Amino acid sequence: MNQTNFGFKKVDYTKKQGLVNNVFSNVADKYDLMNDLMSLGLHRLWKDEFIRQIPNLNSHILDVASGSGDIALKLAKKARDRVNNISLTLSDINEEMLKQAKKKAIDLNLFQNLKFTVASAEELPFLDDSFDYYTIAFGIRNVPDINKALKEACRVLKPMGKFICLEFSKVKEGYMKDFYKFYSFNIIPSIGQMIAGNKEAYEYLVESIDLFPSQDEFRIMIKDAGFEEVGYKNLSGGIVAIHSAYTR
């Protein structure tokens, strides 16, 4: 039996996606609020830096694991302000999360040039060489087969297309590392219980972060998927990192 991690638990590979879906379906309506509380608002700064990695908004952009649409809607607003002709596809395997994204897009009057697709990052329903940019923020670690998702990213990007990934990473400095670990395992699940009524979902969250490969390990995985010019930039001392790469 093929096994993989669901947090610290070992589960059958075929069951992981359903378990992850349940986590996000159960917290979808509190997802944005929890992001603000857990990160003390820092996630907004991280995401602003992330979208700066996309200089050309006259582009076809695929946002995978789009969730409640934070990244895609930031890009859509920036493109509207610049009067750029952007084409954005928001893809997520969880329909409840995409519903949140659609609501936000309507509220912000940003629905134009947006497409919504329920799909797995491992099996994207798009032709080869379809997009100029592939973005994924805080989603890749939830994919059952990360290597397969990276190869799919490489497949759907045009030649010299750019892959950009924002993900929790490894803090290296001693005192900060210790504080971060304490905060993650003791404070975040408690906030999850108080606000979202779901401690287990946020225990999974911090466990999945703890198990995610280091910056350099993930860089090698991206390169092995077929990308070139692979690099990363640490933010907030390595709490998160922006990984980027290009297709041939």
Swiss-Prot record:
PROSITE patterns: SAM_MT_UBIE (PS51608), UBIE_1 (PS01183), UBIE_2 (PS01184). It comes from the Bacteria. S-adenosyl-L-methionine binds at S68, D92. Keywords: Menaquinone biosynthesis, Methyltransferase, S-adenosyl-L-methionine, Transferase, Ubiquinone biosynthesis. It catalyses: a 2-demethylmenaquinol + S-adenosyl-L-methionine = a menaquinol + S-adenosyl-L-homocysteine + H(+); a 2-methoxy-6-(all-trans-polyprenyl)benzene-1,4-diol + S-adenosyl-L-methionine = a 5-methoxy-2-methyl-3-(all-trans-polyprenyl)benzene-1,4-diol + S-adenosyl-L-homocysteine + H(+). GO terms for molecular function: 2-methoxy-6-polyprenyl-1,4-benzoquinol methyltransferase activity; demethylmenaquinone methyltransferase activity. The keyword Transferase applies. Signal peptide: none annotated. GO terms for biological process: aerobic respiration; menaquinone biosynthetic process; methylation. Its EC number is 2.1.1.163, 2.1.1.201. Pathway: Quinol/quinone metabolism; menaquinone biosynthesis; menaquinol from 1,4-dihydroxy-2-naphthoate: step 2/2; Cofactor biosynthesis; ubiquinone biosynthesis. Belongs to the class I-like SAM-binding methyltransferase superfamily. MenG/UbiE family. Methyltransferase required for the conversion of demethylmenaquinol (DMKH2) to menaquinol (MKH2) and the conversion of 2-polyprenyl-6-methoxy-1,4-benzoquinol (DDMQH2) to 2-polyprenyl-3-methyl-6-methoxy-1,4-benzoquinol (DMQH2). This is Ubiquinone/menaquinone biosynthesis C-methyltransferase UbiE. It comes from Rickettsia peacockii (strain Rustic). The gene is ubiE.
